[in-house]
């Protein structure tokens, strides 16, 4: 078995990239590269053919790369053993080394017949059994067979969870609203009581189903919110038995679930080889099923499985997740880009960037290697974004004319679910999608800006004073991803595409992308502070800042 990887910056392939960057790479100009190569788009784009959902296009030609850069990046992927790491994940090896766990969210969407082994046990029978349980329950609720404590049909579903138990289902139910089956979906995550209170104002206790999503059924925020929701239900129903009609659990803790009042037959389980931020494919996706129906949930799984197969079987140079990952490494580790923008030109995808903030930053926001050594190179970027065209009127100014390099992914569907005004809205949206990547690449030179101002009637000092402000340097890198339509299948494929991109980058950086110890310290300290908020006495047990904050808050309770 191959030994541990050397630090990335000591890897010969990395050093060759650094040498090329220093000598030529930093000066690559995307606009010039297009002038020199008429076939650049066909060379640096990829079309993935699906059976029923059209093609998925990845255009990565508007990047600061040429053949030399690309060959060096691929060489880096090979020496970092990306292919072997990929195979280890799919084969059920315990690649989450700090928790000694397999990483097999891909098994949840395995639509084939091959076994998937974890510790020599095929997990697929259990996966299929849980899916069958989800299907049965989903159909009962949507059809009206399952009813509330007063006999009324369920109209609203409230998912109570946090982190991966909230962000994924929320993003997907929003993205797939056109496929909704009529139930109204609500999500409560924040321990701030306002979140729950505002949702409860909108629903009727007789027709509301609560989903409590917590593997251990001990997550503080989730159980606190669930307990308050139960209190609200009982205040209205006056019947303890009503809990079983209005609450189900996504958990593996049967004792805690039944103690809460939920019938254990309405408990949906998952496994320790499913990480929270990769769990929407599991029982955590029950709220998705109830929103769009189980058949559409299966299409979501199918799309992810399609991308899994592409990632697993395609050579690195034509592998979409690998391509995105390598481009990210190029900008993060050589151009020192600190952020990456996800910019979907589809309103239904308005939570996509927020979802992958967790997916990327919780996975690759690490400063030590798998061997526990502090790394001396950049790892995970800050991920952010908003839907177009809203972002254009907010932060694109900085992307176009700011001092920081911000690589961007633009995502758009060729077809809209809402072709209102004869499709006019969507044509305007797409024209902006297309124009932005062109503008970021080409920019506007001094001469072009001068000619434009002259044509507008400016001259002399007035022109000279305004001229520098009208110049766009350009050469801003972008990827464009186009799907035929946002469907359950294409959304599943998009999510899996980014999941695998994150995985590949983690392998190259030699970090564990599947733990999240960074969330623990704050929670530990919060437990120590919470009892200090049970009384009005001043505290002096912390640093002066924390003491001052606690005492100021207490003083303002009066």
Swiss-Prot record:
Family: Belongs to the GPI family.
UniProt keyword Plastid, yes or no: no
Catalytic reaction list: alpha-D-glucose 6-phosphate = beta-D-fructose 6-phosphate
Top EC class of this enzyme: isomerase
CDD domains membership: SIS_PGI_1, SIS_PGI_2
Protein known as: Glucose-6-phosphate isomerase
Presence of the UniProt keyword Cytoplasm in the record: yes
Locations listed in the record: Cytoplasm
């Amino acid at each position: 078995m191959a030994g541990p990887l050397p630090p990335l910056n000591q890897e010969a392939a990395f050093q060759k990239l650094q040498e090329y960057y220093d000598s030529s790479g930093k000066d690559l100009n995307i606009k010039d590269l297009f002038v020199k190569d008429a076939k650049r788009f066909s060379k640096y784009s990829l079309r993935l053919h699906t059976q029923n959902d059209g093609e998925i296009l990845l255009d990565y030609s508007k990047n600061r790369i040429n053949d030399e850069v690309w060959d060096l990046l691929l060489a880096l992927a090979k020496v970092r053993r990306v292919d072997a790491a990929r195979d280890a994940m799919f084969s059920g090896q315990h690649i989450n080394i700090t928790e000694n766990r397999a990483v097999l969210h891909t098994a949840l969407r395995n639509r084939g017949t091959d076994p998937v082994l974890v510790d020599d046990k095929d997990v697929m029978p259990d996966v299929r059994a849980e899916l069958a349980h989800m299907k049965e329950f989903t159909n009962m609720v949507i059809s009206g067979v399952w009813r509330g404590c007063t006999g009324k049909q369920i109209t609203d579903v409230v998912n109570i969870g946090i982190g991966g138990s909230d962000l994924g289902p929320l993003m997907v139910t929003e993205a797939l609203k056109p496929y909704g089956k009529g139930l109204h979906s609500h999500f409560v995550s924040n321990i701030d009581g306002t979140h729950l209170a505002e949702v409860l104002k909108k629903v009727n206790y007789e027709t509301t189903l609560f989903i409590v999503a917590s593997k251990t059924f001990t997550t503080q925020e989730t159980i606190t919110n669930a307990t308050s929701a139960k209190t609200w239900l009982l205040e209205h129903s006056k019947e303890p038995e009503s809990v079983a009609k209005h609450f189900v659990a996504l958990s593996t803790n049967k004792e805690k679930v039944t103690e809460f009042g939920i019938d254990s037959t309405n408990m949906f389980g998952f496994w320790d080889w499913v990480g929270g931020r990769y769990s929407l494919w599991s029982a955590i996706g029950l709220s998705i099923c109830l929103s769009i129906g189980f058949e559409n949930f299966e299409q979501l799984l199918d799309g992810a499985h399609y991308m899994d197969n592409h990632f697993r079987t395609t050579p690195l140079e034509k592998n979409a997740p690998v391509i995105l990952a390598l481009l990210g490494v190029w900008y993060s580790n050589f151009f020192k880009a600190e952020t990456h923008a996800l910019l979907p030109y589809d309103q239904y995808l308005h939570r996509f960037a927020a979802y992958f903030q967790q997916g990327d930053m919780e996975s690759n926001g690490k400063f030590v290697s798998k061997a526990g050594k502090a790394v001396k190179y950049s790892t995970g970027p800050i991920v952010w974004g908003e839907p177009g065209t809203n972002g254009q009127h907010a932060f694109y100014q900085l992307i176009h004319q700011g001092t920081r390099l911000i690589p961007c992914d633009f995502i758009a569907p060729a077809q809209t679910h809402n072709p209102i005004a004869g499709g006019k809205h969507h044509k305007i949206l797409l024209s902006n999608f297309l124009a932005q990547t062109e503008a970021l690449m080409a920019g506007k030179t001094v001469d072009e800006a001068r000619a434009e101002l002259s044509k507008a009637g400016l001259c002399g000092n007035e022109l000279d004073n305004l001229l520098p402000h009208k110049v766009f340097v350009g050469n801003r890198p972008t990827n464009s991803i186009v799907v035929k339509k946002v469907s359950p299948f294409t959304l599943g494929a998009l999510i899996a595409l980014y999941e695998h991109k994150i995985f590949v980058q983690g392998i190259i950086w030699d970090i564990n992308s599947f733990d999240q110890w960074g969330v623990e310290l704050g929670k530990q300290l919060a437990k120590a502070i919470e009892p200090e908020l049970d009384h009005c006495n001043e505290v002096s047990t912390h640093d002066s800042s924390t003491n001052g904050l606690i005492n100021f808050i207490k003083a303002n309770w009066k």
